[in-house]
Regions:
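Extended catalytic cores of very large enzyme megasubunits
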Residues: 1-800
């Protein structure tokens, strides 16, 4: 082979040293089986990518990409790639090292320097280095060995999305620096900030829980906008509309996700008395929000985004449903803002009875937005009588079932608008003493009141369930309890520390101290336990886990209230009356006049907790289950409560394109001695194992993918969790059918089972692209292309 020189970071050249590379690969294989064969495999394939003048950065990337090409054959290569990427991060930020002990010492030595330098450059808050923290003690706690818990996608996601960078874009944080920076940034107000930061760090660095994206990006930073979710309701006047655009821009800039309610805006054609003209209606103003989202720079890490909400009695609701359609007037379409419909029980009952549904101009029916449950139904019927008697300027009516099908047809085509239920949200709310909840947030899991003086905010952490399941398939309940309580305290601290340039958001945050503790990794733990997602065992486990976490989250908030005081609007809340989330199920049944079909069995001492919460609660809300798409990558687990989308698929993210192979499936098939013989067949079937002979039925049941499960399983899982969750749940739906009548049944069942919200609808594609693999004749490639500067796949043969 022609001599190859490597250009080092200082510009000097040195001959390519295969032994040096092989040693690095071997070290990355530590603890894995067949280490030598893995090194040989990677080293052989690496030869094809080398060229004279390759830089050390290019060489590092070439090694990693070569390793990743083999993930399809053995997921162990993902671990190797993660370790190699981590080594490049360490070298770039800390310098060279040889042993794990040296790496730990480098972390301890460099962390205080990093904090002080970042504060000096204005990247970190001055409080990080003002003496309240013992930086040496914190640095001594850093444990880079915990980075080995991460998969490759987790490492690259943290590096590209969450790690602190200089203004020139160069990263200055290792993963453990990131964890500690976040822990410190959420401990300023503790009596012993160092001890608190160490506790938070230990939970986060062990991936027991992960804060929401905005917190990960901004904690400890010079402008700590840490809240994840913002909910604002637009009033029917120009000042409110203009302010909503401004507020949207500020929130998006700070990486927050936004829910925006537009139901109050008068309909198109409605008189505008001040100018003696007619209103253009809410749709053009929604377009303004959409444009603002596109225009704002969002730190280049975590994109800000919004969901626009409207109740379906609005006269312009038909145009609202079309907002996400690809065709039509572009000025009446939103390309960046999502849409969601806020649905009343009255509408769902009319769908069931096949009755008419009336649409009104909010200018003539302004109180409907503030009413819910029985009060809404009574007032709505009064407006119907007024309309039919000619006492309203304008109205429209359609069969309720027809409108429902219209919504669901759009949902099938565009995955919008998402379906959320106003009355279920408000009747079951424990914090509705401060007003009506008019909408949810970007991801449909936050349910907080908002008005002109309050832009509701919520702060998120998600518990990684898989971190508490032992190898022997037992649960570490004590550690889960500790993590839940620590997460609540961490989130409560966040309420005092977070900043935003919007006074109404700061006011709401201080008045409610709302937090949302969620879960992720459900599908991951079900697979490890051998439970099918649609089994009774799975449903009971979801029930048990969410009850346990809810109980200890509520208990911790009550303890914090005793220590620090209740949130300011506690008096008059459901909590102050000793009402808990599980108690509101009967309240909802009474309001509907029909029993909500939710299993209400309990396992813990809820009577004792009822007495305790009457005395005080630190937070208006405690739980909300977010989708966790990105922080799930960081934790190396499955998102939220979703099933596996597929066992093998290509994932495209802002961080690149990655091949995802279900490690649990590979592990189980390896135990049965089936993986090596069947992996090609599994790839040919695009990861679908249901029709592959030789795989036991129990394995097939456990590894059903989202489109192979009954949609009623998604509803059952969410219903079991929702009874314990005081806010809501991001419930993605996956349907194989395109029958709209079946959609009506499914979403009606979701309402009957007490779900507060749903999120995206994913419909199984009609066609799947043909898969190919690339087989390379390595010997021919090396012999013939020896004079080529860049080697690649010139002699590749396509296998179909």
């Amino acid at each position: 082979m022609k001599e190859i020189n490597v250009v080092k970071r200082d510009g000097t050249k040195e001959p390519f040293d295969a032994n040096k590379i092989n040693t690095a690969i071997l070290k990355a294989c530590e603890g894995l089986p067949d280490q030598i064969s893995k090194v040989v495999q990677v080293a052989t394939e690496l030869q094809l990518t080398l060229f004279d003048g390759i830089t050390t950065e290019q060489l590092d990337e070439a090694v990693i990409q070569t390793v990743l090409q083999n993930v399809k054959d053995d997921p162990d290569y993902d671990k190797i790639a993660a370790r190699l990427l981590l080594k490049t991060v360490y070298k770039q930020i800390l310098g060279d090292y040889e042993t794990a002990e040296e790496l730990k010492k480098l972390h301890a030595r460099e962390f205080p320097k990093f904090v002080k330098a970042a504060v000096k450059e204005g990247l970190l808050d001055k409080r990080m280095a003002d003496g309240r923290f013992d930086l040496k003690k914190l640095a001594a706690e850093l444990d880079p060995a915990r980075d080995d818990l991460s998969k490759y996608l987790g490492v690259v996601t943290n590096k590209n999305r969450y790690a602190l960078r200089k203004q020139n874009g160069s990263p200055i944080e290792t993963p453990q620096f990131t964890h500690m920076r976040i822990a410190m940034g959420l401990s300023y107000n503790e009596s012993d900030p160092t001890t608190a930061a160490i506790e938070f760090y230990n939970h986060m660095s062990n991936l027991e829980y992960v804060p929401g994206g905005s917190t990960r990006v901004n904690a400890g930073g010079s402008f700590p906008q840490l809240s994840n979710c913002f909910l604002l309701n637009v009033d029917d006047d120009m000042e409110s509309i203009a302010k909503a655009v401004r507020d949207t821009m500020w929130i998006a800039k700070g990486t927050g996700g936004i829910g925006i309610g537009f139901t109050k805006l008068r309909a198109a054609g409605s008189p505008v008395k001040t100018t003696n003209t007619e209103s253009t209606g809410p749709i053009p103003f929604m377009k303004m929000i959409d444009t603002a989202l596109f225009a704002v720079s969002r730190k280049g890490k975590k994109a800000g985004a919004a969901a626009i909400y409207m109740e379906n009695w609005h006269l312009n609701f038909d145009q609202f449903v079309d907002l996400r359609q690809n065709s039509g007037d572009p000025y009446l379409r939103t390309r960046f803002a999502n849409t969601a419909v806020f649905i009343s029980d009255e509408f769902m009952k009319r769908v069931e009875k096949d009755q008419d549904w009336y649409l009104f101009d909010p200018a003539e029916t302004p109180d409907l937005t503030e009413l819910y449950g029985e009060e809404f139904s009574a007032r709505y019927k009064e407006y119907i009588k007024m309309a039919e008697a000619g006492k309203l300027r304008t109205f429209d009516k359609v069969p309720a079932r027809q409108q429902f099908k219209r919504i669901l047809t759009s949902l099938q085509a565009t995955s919008h608008p998402w379906l959320t239920w106003k009355d279920t949200i408000n009747v079951r709310a424990l914090n509705n003493n401060t007003g009506t909840i008019h909408l949810s947030n970007l991801c449909t899991e936050i349910t907080l009141p908002q008005d002109k003086n309050n832009i509701a905010t919520c702060n998120l952490v998600s518990i990684n369930l898989s971190a508490f399941l032992s190898e022997d398939k037992t649960w570490d309940w004590d550690r889960l309890k500790e993590a839940a309580r620590a997460a609540v305290r961490q989130l409560d601290n966040l309420c005092d520390i977070t900043q935003t340039p919007i006074p109404e958001a700061m006011h709401s945050n201080q008045q409610t101290r709302a937090i949302g503790l969620g879960i992720m990794g459900l599908s991951d733990v079900l697979e490890k336990l051998g439970y099918c997602y649609e089994s009774k065992e799975a449903y009971d486990l979801v029930d048990q886990l969410t009850e346990f976490i809810s109980y200890h989250a509520i208990d911790q908030s009550a303890d914090l209230a005793k220590e620090l005081g209740s949130y300011p609007t506690f008096a008059g809340s459901g909590w102050s009356k000793g009402i808990l989330p599980i108690d509101t199920v009967d309240k909802l049944s009474k309001d509907r006049g029909v029993k909500v079909k939710i299993d209400q069995k309990t396992r813990l001492d809820w009577d004792g907790l009822r007495k305790k919460v009457k005395k005080g609660m630190r937070n208006a809300t405690l739980m909300a289950i977010a989708p966790t798409a990105n922080i799930g990558h960081v934790a190396g687990t499955t998102p939220g409560i979703d099933p596996q989308f597929a066992q093998i698929f290509s994932r495209s993210t802002l961080n690149g394109k990655f091949l995802e192979v279900n490690h649990n499936l590979v592990r189980d098939l390896k135990k049965l001695g089936l993986w090596d013989n069947l992996k090609d067949e599994i790839f040919a079937a695009q990861g679908d194992i249901q029709d592959i002979d030789g795989i036991p039925q129990n394995i097939k049941d456990v590894y059903k993918t989202s489109f192979q499960l009954s949609p009623y399983a998604f509803i059952e899982v969410a219903a079991r969790a929702q009874k314990w969750v005081d806010q809501a749940i991001s419930r993605n739906m996956y349907l194989e059918t395109r029958d709209i009548d079946e959609y009506v049944k499914i979403y009606s069942e979701a309402w009957k089972r007490g779900l507060k919200t749903t999120y995206y609808l994913h419909v199984k594609p009609r066609h799947q692209s043909e898969q190919t693999t690339v087989s390379v004749d390595k010997i021919a490639e090396q012999k013939v292309r020896t004079n080529s500067k860049v080697r690649g796949f010139g002699f590749a043969k396509i296998n179909k």
